[in-house]
Amino acid sequence: MADLVYPPVIGAIKLFWKYLGLKFDFKGVEHIPREGGAVLSINHIGYLDFALAGTAALPAGRYVRFMAKKEIFDNKLAGPLMRGMHHICVDRSSGTASFVAALRALRSGEVIGIFPEGTISVSFEIKELKTGAVRLAMGAGVPVIPTIVWGSQRIWTKKVKRNLRRKKVPITVAFGAPLYFDKNSDVEAGEKLLRETMISMLHEVQEKYPDSHQGQRWAPVRLGGIAPAPLN
C-alpha cells in the first residue's frame, strides 16, 4: 500500500523527540520480521506509547499500523493523518469490523500494533489482557511480538498533567522473542503466556532503567513509587 503520509509524520515526530531530548534505548529490534505480518502487543502507560513503539520499529524497516479508538479518527486534525497512515479504527459499536480489518492487514503482510490492556494502566503495571492479539495471530498465522515501553508515562499519561517541556527522559522500548500460536491453540492459555511474558519483560526493563523509581509519581508501588496501586 502507498505510504504518502507516514514518512512526513515520522519526520515531524523525530523533530519532536529531538526537541524533548529523549534518551532512547531500543532493544530486540531484530525480533521484528523484516517482511510478513506480525502483531506487536504493547503495554500501555502513556499517550505517546504508539508513537514511541512506531519509532522503535523503524530500524526494522517497518511501519506499524495501530489499532486505535474511533474518537481519534473523528478528530479533525488527527483523523486524516490516522487514515493516511492506514491505522485501523476500533469502533466498539460496529462489532467485528476492526478485527476483520486487522486480520486482512496481517494477511497482506502488515505489522499491526495493539494495546491488549485496552486502556492506560494508571498503576503502570500490566493489567489483565484482552484476547485480541492472540486471536489475530492465530487467525492470520503470524507471530506476536511482546513489546514494552517504559518512560513515556513521565511525559504524558492519564490523570497527570502533561509535561511536554520535560527534557532528556530515558525511554526504553523492548521487543521480545516472537510467540507463535497455531489455529488450534487455546486462546486463554495463549493470553496467559503473553501476559506473563510481558510482565517478565517489564520487570527486566525497569531493573535496567537508569533513573531511580523511589518516591516517583511515575513509578509503581512495587518499585517504591507512589503511582496508584493496581486494582487487581
Language model: regions and residue ranges:
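Membrane-interfacial terminal anchoring regions of lipid-handling membrane enzymes
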Residues: 1-19, 23-34, 104-107, 152, ...
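Catalytic core of membrane glycerolipid acyltransferases/transacylases, capturing the structured
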Residues: 20, 33-94
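Hydrophobic/aromatic ligand-binding patch that stacks against planar heteroaromatic rings
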Residues: 56, 81, 104, 135-139
